[in-house]
């Protein structure tokens, strides 16, 4: 990327007079995007887990850097990605340590019963929809409910802003298990919550509670086009700076 930057500077020196100011700004934006892509790819390649979709990770990283730099999430190294483009029978919950560049936990996770069967295909922010909601969430406080230890979530976008009012939380459920898949052909479904397997879930909640970032991904065109977090342009220096500040 150093060579790219030098090439860009040389082009401005040698032929910049041929470009308008607007064209030079646009060209600079492309360089910034390329820088971020390269940095995101380097982390992704270090993680080296084919279950993790690159686009899901890259989009989640964009939101992480923007929100952490603005002080809107805790500046620790955890980013949780739920990839709703994958089968519910496959691992699609990924707890990533960006500092160590590795996945420290992955598992199956349920989606809302009205979002689809084995695959989630429909999403909603409406109260009573019993569908999953895509987008960025900030984890909040824990409580003990009918499912045991549970973690409240606050939606940060138009696509999930009703999360708290809808009681969308992370909790464990007996229908989230390989036994259920074997007996029913697919994973069980929730009322909209990202439900986890019972084994080890309390440790996961303990790691990500109180202000870390969770991103629920699905390649839905309207969301990817209109989300301010998914479309934010990042500087490589911003990414590196935020990660250096993590615990």
Model-predicted regions and their roles:
Residues 1-26:
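Bacterial Sec-dependent N-terminal signal peptides
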Residues 23-191, 198-212, 221-247:
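Cell wall/extracellular polymer interaction/catalysis modules
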Residues 218:
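Active-site proximal loops enriched in glycine and acidic residues that flank catalytic Cys/His/Asp
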